Every structure is written in structure tokens, then in C-alpha cells.
Amino acid sequence: MSDKPTETVSVSESVATPAVAATEPAPSLPVVNPSSLPSGFEWWRQTMAYKTGFMSAEESVQYEQDRLIKERYAECLSCEKNKQWVMAYSPTVRFMKDQIEKIGGDISSNNVFCDHCDDFKAGGFHPKYGILVCQNHVKSRSHLEDTLAHEMVHYYDNTKFKVDWMNLKHHACSEIRASTLSGECRMMNELMKGKLARLTRGHQECAKRRAILSVMANPGCKDEAQATQVVNEVWDSCFNDTRPFDTIYR
């Protein structure tokens, strides 16, 4: 198979463009060691006082800040634990990592980051910084696996084809490939979301739907009509381009 992409190649979904996770900065929080925050009985006492209105306004603000720090810390720990497991044991993720390294890319825990995201994305890819996993939106280990596999397809495309992420056809093609190959559009996922009305073409409809939504987020895209047109133009070649896989496995 030629190294030339079958259309112009594309990019990411939990994305934002240009191949970037367009996540807004999370609200600024002070740098605090979570172990220094109230815990055990004292944290329970503060929680009860907060819920029953026995805190002053100043105490309530401090409690809400402490609670947010605790929640984000717990999210981060869970995301990091699942990330490490998936990168070590997921056949899809390990295969993609090997394929990326074969074409000169370098992907490891050092450029796959867990962080809090304000927009409703599961993750994103940036050609300079790597992969972002949105710790507050990834619901489970399997969801993280699908998200990481999706973004790794973008990473692969960017490394192999030198994608221009502001080119809507490039972006659309990689989005189609990422949704098709990552497993996020497999039948069970769609059934659980209640979106698989027609079993025979559910996978394709899912990949197309997700690609259109991602292209719509590209600053160079005018509206849904343009995104739909671009996705349709590259659909056949990009959906059938399963590199680096032999076929659609998930």
C-alpha cells in the first residue's frame, strides 16, 4: 500500500481543531497538597455543616474550593490509573503505539495527559503536545481505551501523512478513520447510547455523525452543511482506509 493518504488525511474527534483538544482552561485553583485538606470526621463535619447551612459565607466558599480540589484530585488519580493499565494491556492501544513508533513517532505516558476539561469532550490531540484525556468526562476504563485509541489514530495520521489540520478534508478524513478504527462506534456502544436504529449501517452512521460534529468545531468550517459536505466528499476513501490495521477489528 502506498504511503500516500487516500484523500488528504485528517484528524481528531474529542477534538477541536486544528487537531487540538479545544478545551477551555479549567477554573484556577490554588496549588494545594490534597493530603493537607480536612479528611475523615472533620471533612464529614464540614460537609454536614455546609449542607445544613451552619457555615458562614466565607466558610462555605472555602469548603466548596476544598471539595473541588478533592474531586479533581480523585479524578486525576482514577484517570492516571486507568491510563497506565490501558497503555500496558489494551491490545488496540499497544498495537497503535507500536505502529506509531515504527513510523518515527514517540508516544508514552509522558505525552498522554489526564486533565480537567470544561468543554464536553472525552479527549483531544495536539501535534506538538500529544494526547489529552479529559478526566472528568471519561466514564470508565473502556471509555478511556476508546478515547485513547481514537486520539492515537490522529497521532498516527499526523506522523505518517503530515496532516494540515486546518484543511477540512484532512480533518474530516482523520475523524472518519479515528471513529471507525478506535472501537467507539462498535455495535454495543451505540446500543447503550440508544442510537443504533438500523443495525446494518450503525457503525458507518456513527462514524459519519461523529466526524461531522468534529469538523464543525474547526475554525475554518462555516456550518453543519459544510461539515457534512466535506465528510461526504472524503467518506469512501477514508472509511475504507484502515491503516495501520488490516481491517476494522473493533
Curated annotation (Swiss-Prot):
Keywords: Hydrolase, Membrane, Metal-binding, Metalloprotease, Mitochondrion, Mitochondrion inner membrane, Protease. Its EC number is 3.4.24.-. GO terms for cellular component: mitochondrial inner membrane. GO terms for molecular function: metal ion binding; metalloendopeptidase activity. A divalent metal cation binds at residues 150, 154. InterPro entries: Peptidase_M76_ATP23 (IPR019165). The keyword Nucleus does not apply. The active site is at residue 151. It is found in: Mitochondrion inner membrane. It is a peripheral membrane protein. One of its GO terms (biological process) is mitochondrial proton-transporting ATP synthase complex assembly. PROSITE patterns: ZINC_PROTEASE. Belongs to the peptidase M76 family. Has a dual role in the assembly of mitochondrial ATPase. Acts as a protease that removes N-terminal residues of mitochondrial ATPase CF(0) subunit 6 at the intermembrane space side. Also involved in the correct assembly of the membrane-embedded ATPase CF(0) particle, probably mediating association of subunit 6 with the subunit 9 ring. This is Mitochondrial inner membrane protease ATP23. It comes from Yarrowia lipolytica (strain CLIB 122 / E 150) (Yeast).
